[in-house]
Amino acid sequence: MIKKFTFPILIFCSFALLACNNSANSIEPSTVSSKKDNLEVHEKLNAKDQEIVNEYNQATDLITTGDVAGFHHQIKALIPQIKTISDDKQRNLILMNVYTQLEMNQDAFDLNEKLLKKNPSSDKQEFQCFLLKQLNKKEDLPTCYETAAGLLKKELSHPEAKKNPDYPYSQWSYYFYMYQAGHTEYKEKMLNLIQSTSDTKIKSNLQTAFDDEILNK
């Protein structure tokens, strides 16, 4: 799995979910993607689950009208029902969307912690670090980023990883995690990577990330 470039971190996912009964959204917590890009084959939800998903989707329509307060009110009221969805992936996805939209950071942290224990990934771990910042638990950040770096290093050890054109982003993310974990020598590694990158678009993106996440902090 190649780490997508996600700086600054955007924590909310696409609003519309499950427009069709036979589709599912597979967005990682720390990644923003369109519904179209994340559709995959999925067994049909049972009638009760689908009814709840439909209610959530209807609530998201308020965003298009600019009624953010109304949207927040409706999705908060739906939380007890969302928790009864039997499909694990859809329940967790929608709950995470709701928690992040309502800035229920402790609830998002607790849910993400459960997801990490079940299926660890650098994306989820990165999101956990973000939530620690939101919860003002800065003392836990070095360990969190160290763990994220370890997970990403394992993901990048797969033979196909370096063949992916997005590999420089993943490599930069690893250096960034290590820097955030307290290994200050990785600042120089980030700069060297930027300077050695030949692709102008990637180079520009990496430089912007460095400026935003390192220089301007």
Q: What is each model feature region?
A:
Residues 170-217:
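Terminal, low-structured helical/coil segments at or just beyond the last alpha-helical repeat
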Residues 71-80, 105-116, 139-155, 183-197:
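Alpha-helical repeat scaffolds
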